[in-house]
Amino acid sequence: VMLAYTFSNLSSALMSNLGLIVFTYTFGLGSGRIALVVGVQFLFAILSQKPWAALSARRGKRYALAAGFIMSVAGGLYFCALVLLRDRVGDSPLAFMPFSVLAGSGIGALFTLPLAMVADTVDLDEAAGGERIEGTYFGALTFAYKFSQAAALVLIGLALDLAGFDSSLAAQGRGTVLALGLLLGLGASVSFGAAALVLRGYGLDEAAVQANRARIRALRGGGE
């Protein structure tokens, strides 16, 4: 869970930070249109919470979170297509709506499911007769989040250098804007894909979660 959380937060940080540069220089979007694209993305991140909760209850948290990551990968690949077709896309915000819906909904799974999966791991420890160490687990998630944000800043700096970005110029070269757009789309897709792959190591399904909770109730009842 920690590795998946790191990779997915890295992708999210790339989209939110490098994305503003790409929207401005690659597509020529103004601040109002950028706000619309990003606003729709956040809206679907919020609206997706109930569907993700329903899917996790039916198929398990790992399945739901992996589905969210795959949606984000699809959003990143669609973004790459927009970059390649940027001359046709222009600065129309409507062309970005599928990206906003896919990426926003996918990132929505990141908001709650990893935390719930860590809580299930804490229950597993207690059910096995161990101690509850919530502080250790959630502290590790906090570290993973901060590490991913710091790593994103380093990667963005490298991407800008590799693409030949010059902040003193009002307009960047065609090769530069193409490279920045593809680095963002492909980089985010690869990172979300890696997050989905490492989730394969998480073995708690909903049946195991319910069994652990029943075991905990029995242990606590016996100690009273």
Where are the language model's segments positioned?
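Membrane-embedded alpha-helical bundles of multi-pass transporters/translocases
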Residues: 1-224
